[in-house]
């Protein structure tokens, strides 16, 4: 059976686990900076300056991490 990797979940889980700061660009151009505290299929919880924000994924255009994410390392851990 082939393992399907959900790239979105791998990315969000790694920035959450490693406490990597991200910048989220919304479709309206607004920027949010902070740390991912949790996520599900529809939302991301972002901690920004000690305040939590619930962001709907359909409103997100782009997510930029402050450091590069190694997808190969993350996908191996999930496959184990």
Swiss-Prot record:
GO CC, alphabetical: cytosol
Pfam families the record matches: Hfq (PF17209)
Signal sequence residues: none
One BP annotation, GO: regulation of RNA stability
Gene Ontology molecular-function annotations: RNA binding
Keyword line: RNA-binding, Stress response
Residue intervals of the Sm domain: 9-69
InterPro entries reported for this sequence: Hfq (IPR005001), LSM_dom_sf (IPR010920), Sm (IPR047575)
Subunit structure: Homohexamer.
NCBIfam families: Hfq, PRK00395.1
Cited PANTHER family: RNA-BINDING PROTEIN HFQ (PTHR34772:SF1)
Role this protein plays: RNA chaperone that binds small regulatory RNA (sRNAs) and mRNAs to facilitate mRNA translational regulation in response to envelope stress, environmental stress and changes in metabolite concentrations. Also binds with high specificity to tRNAs.
UniProt similarity note: Belongs to the Hfq family.
Protein name per its UniProtKB record: RNA-binding protein Hfq
Lineage of source species: Bacteria, Bacillati, Bacillota, Clostridia, Peptostreptococcales
């Amino acid at each position: 059976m082939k393992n399907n990797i959900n790239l979105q979940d791998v990315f969000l889980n790694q920035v959450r686990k490693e406490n990597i700061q991200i910048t989220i660009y919304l479709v309206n151009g607004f920027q949010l900076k902070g740390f991912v505290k949790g996520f599900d299929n529809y939302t991301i919880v972002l901690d920004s300056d000690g305040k939590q924000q619930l962001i709907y994924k359909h409103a997100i255009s782009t997510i930029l991490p402050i450091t590069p994410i190694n997808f190969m390392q993350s996908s191996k851990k999930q496959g184990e």
